[in-house]
Structure formats: C-alpha cells, structure tokens
C-alpha cells in the first residue's frame, strides 16, 4: 500500500493537471474564439496618420468624379494637429497666405527643436 505522502502527492499532481487541462480547453474552445471576435468587432477601426508625414501638404481624395467641385484638404502634424478644407477657388485665392502661415509654423518648430534637447 502506498504511503500517505505518496497518495497526497498524486492527488495534488492530479488536481494541478486537471486545472491545467481545464484552462487549456477553455482557451482553445470555440466559445472563447467567438467571444474574442465579438470584442474585436466592437472596436471602431482606427484612422492612424504617421507623424513622419507632418508638414507635407497632401490632398485626401485625389480620385473625385469628373465635374465635381475641386476640394483640397490639407492636414499636418506639427506640435499639434491642423486640418483645413478649401475649394479650388479658395485655394487659388489664399494659397500664398496659407503657404506663409505653414512655413512660419514649421520654421518656429525647427528653431525650437534644438533648444529643447
């Protein structure tokens, strides 16, 4: 007959093995996968814009239908986010002032950056 220490050890190992098996089966069960998919589907898709593009002027929608009014959207990330929407006529009227404004902001940032380090 096995000693009481051996029986207790076997029971302890059996309980640990059972816990491990239950944890693995719940992780791999289809119900767990469905729950994960539901969690992921609730998250709205993130619209990420890399900061490396900061300072570049870029139209958002270049493939507009012919005959549609030209619209330009300018976005950049300096120390803050800026977004501007202009029609083609407005852009023609204000392009020089807008260019000077952007240049002043970017030059100020470039001058301040080495001083921060």
Curated annotation (Swiss-Prot):
Signal peptide location in the record? 1-23
Quote the Pfam families the UniProt record gives: Motilin_assoc, Motilin_ghrelin
Q: Which GO terms describe its cellular component?
A: axon; extracellular region; extracellular space
Q: Which residues, in ranges, are excised as the propeptide? A: 52-75, 99-117
The record places the lipid (O-decanoyl serine) at 26
GO annotation terms (biological process) = actin polymerization or depolymerization; decidualization; dendrite development; gastric acid secretion; negative regulation of apoptotic process; negative regulation of endothelial cell proliferation; negative regulation of inflammatory response; negative regulation of insulin secretion
List residues with covalent lipid attachment of type O-hexanoyl serine.
Answer: 26
Where is there biased composition of kind Basic and acidic residues? 31-43
Which residues are the lipid attachment points (O-octanoyl serine)? 26
GO molecular-function term, one example from the UniProt record? ghrelin receptor binding
Keywords attached to this entry: Amidation, Hormone, Lipoprotein, Secreted, Signal
Chief location of this protein?
secreted
Q: Posttranslational modification, per the record? A: O-octanoylated by GOAT/MBOAT4. O-octanoylation is essential for ghrelin activity. Amidation of Leu-98 is essential for obestatin activity.
The places in or outside the cell where this protein is found are: Secreted
InterPro entries the UniProt entry points to = Motilin_assoc, Motilin_ghrelin, Preproghrelin
Which domain of life, per UniProt?
Answer: Eukaryota
Q: What is this protein called?
A: Appetite-regulating hormone
Q: Which organism is it from?
A: Papio hamadryas (Hamadryas baboon)
């Amino acid at each position: 007959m096995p000693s009481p220490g051996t029986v207790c050890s076997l029971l302890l190992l059996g309980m640990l093995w059972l816990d491990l098996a239950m944890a693995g089966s719940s992780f791999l069960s289809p119900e767990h996968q469905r729950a994960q998919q539901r969690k992921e589907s609730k998250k709205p898709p993130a619209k990420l814009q890399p900061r490396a593009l900061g300072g570049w002027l870029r139209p958002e929608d270049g493939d507009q239908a012919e005959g549609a009014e030209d619209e330009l959207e300018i976005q950049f990330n300096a120390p803050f986010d800026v977004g501007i929407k202009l029609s083609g006529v407005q852009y023609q009227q204000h392009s020089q002032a807008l260019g000077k404004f952007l240049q002043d902001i970017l030059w100020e940032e470039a001058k301040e950056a080495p001083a921060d380090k």
